[in-house]
A protein has these predicted regions:
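Ubiquitin-like/PB1-type beta-grasp interaction modules and other compact soluble beta-rich domains
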Residues: 1-78
Length: 78
């Protein structure tokens, strides 16, 4: 039985993930995001949710691909 692959976006770059959950640490590896750069889960109609290395995101809960953005400390969200 094949596992479902989930599409997700990090700063508009498309990735595929083979598990139904992903952590902030796994997002860093997948998207080559350096430590010190903040990761946020974009939530339509709500403020973006900060994702720590230990935060787990359930990709099955999203309608369509999950969208993440990154932001260097001290910069304004875009």
């Amino acid at each position: 039985m094949d596992k479902k692959a989930f599409e997700l976006f990090i700063d508009n770059d498309k990735y595929t993930w083979g598990e139904d959950t992903i952590t902030g640490a796994q997002l860093r590896v997948l998207g080559a995001i350096p430590e010190g750069v903040d990761i946020f889960l974009k939530v339509p109609g709500k403020p973006d949710k900060p994702i720590e290395n230990t935060t787990s995101v359930n990709l099955k809960e999203h309608h369509g691909p999950a969208r993440f953005s990154t932001q260097s400390p001290g910069s304004q969200a875009g």
